[in-house]
Amino acid sequence: MTKRRVVVGMSGGVDSSVTAWLLKEQGYDVVGLFMKNWEDDDDGEYCSTRQDWIDVVSVADLIGIDVEAVNFAAEYKDRVFAEFLREYSAGRTPNPDVLCNAEIKFKAFLDHAMSLDAEMIATGHYARVRERDGRFELLKAFDHTKDQSYFLHRLNQAQLSKTMFPLGEIPKTKVREIAAQIGLPNAKKKDSTGICFIGERPFRDFLNRYLPTKPGPMKTPDGKVIGEHIGLAFYTFGQRKGIGLGGSKDGSGEPWFVAAKDIASNTLYVVQGHDHPWLLSRQLVAGNVSWVAGEPPADGFSCGAKTRYRQADAACSFGRPALGRADGERFSLTFDDAQWAVTPGQSAVLYDGEICLGGGIIEFAATGQPGQTAPAAAAGHAGALAEAR
């Protein structure tokens, strides 16, 4: 009997290595595929691509599977990195890992795998896929502390129908145990952290290679200038470190946080205190939406939402602003409790219990007490939010 072929995305890490081993043990015809998504010729100090490939080959030899490398660097720069720079240039804080999953790991990679006569692809992500009544649902992982459905929320029915997440039912501690028991050479390798193409280098240094500095005033909510920023692109909402005000004696003496950006005047607004009103939001508008089921929830639907990775689901209600658009490009969320540092450019991802429904890119979040709203890069969407209320 012909074995079903599964192409596994292998990164050189423990998770994808155990994924490949598990599928081989289950009787699949497993082929490993190593994706090179970044040209790192000048980045040897920070990028680990060469060592990662060595680890992949070592693991493949141990478990007895074929492996190949494919270069998606051109696709990555065109579909992911270019958008990353555009968003930062506009004063927002994007999440390239979300776009990478949708455009590279589950599009370019999936297409390549199908050219190898694969029936399915698999990755080491911590999430689950469930088929019910001919439709595919994206579920949180059994190990909620490692759940990665937030990064996968833009996957569609066609992609999920061809995808396996073997680690979705396994706690991370068990994955490490398996790696050690079968003698994987990378069993003790540290998990990768941060944005894949930046590695361990200082983020500001990396960004400055592509975006110029553009100094401007740093102001308090009452308009007082208390410093100078190096460029709005280099700061994000809720940021505390690296704003140059650690020793300031002004105000209450509490820590300073980035609270807003005014693109028109190139002004960075900072506030004192973690719970300052300008850092708290109960409503947001998100655009560039994507729904796992292909359609949005009903207006007024009660759900949970994350506005950043690892955040606990926050209770909220879903709305569809009347923006004169028939394609459902935007939605609003009204939270039961105020959310901290909701950041334009990040993803707002919706959940119905364990089920990930999809989400969109945050464009605007209403902040402040009545009559006090912080300037924002997406201030043009304030009217849309008013319609959503």
Swiss-Prot record:
Molecular function terms from GO: ATP binding; tRNA binding; tRNA-uridine 2-sulfurtransferase activity
Region named Interaction with target base in tRNA: 95-97
Superkingdom of the source species: Bacteria
Residues bound to ATP: G9, M10, S11, G12, G13, V14, D15, S16, M35, G124
InterPro entries: MnmA-like, MnmA-like_C, MnmA-like_central, MnmA-like_central_sf, Rossmann-like_a/b/a_fold
EC number: 2.8.1.13
Region described as Interaction with tRNA: 146-148, 308-309
UniProt-listed SUPFAM superfamilies: Adenine nucleotide alpha hydrolases-like
Subcellular location: Cytoplasm
Principal location listed in the UniProt entry: cytoplasm
Protein's UniProt keywords contain Disulfide bond: yes
Keyword Cytoplasm assigned: yes
GO cellular component terms attached to this protein's record: cytoplasm
Annotated site (Interaction with tRNA): H125, Q346
One GO-annotated biological process of the protein: tRNA wobble position uridine thiolation
Uppermost EC category: transferase
Keywords: ATP-binding, Cytoplasm, Disulfide bond, Nucleotide-binding, RNA-binding, Transferase, tRNA processing, tRNA-binding
PANTHER family reported for this sequence: MITOCHONDRIAL TRNA-SPECIFIC 2-THIOURIDYLASE 1 (PTHR11933:SF5), TRNA 5-METHYLAMINOMETHYL-2-THIOURIDYLATE -METHYLTRANSFERASE (PTHR11933)
Protein family according to the UniProt entry: Belongs to the MnmA/TRMU family.
HAMAP family: tRNA_thiouridyl_MnmA
Function: Catalyzes the 2-thiolation of uridine at the wobble position (U34) of tRNA, leading to the formation of s(2)U34.
Protein name: tRNA-specific 2-thiouridylase MnmA
Organism whose genome encodes this protein: Burkholderia ambifaria (strain MC40-6)
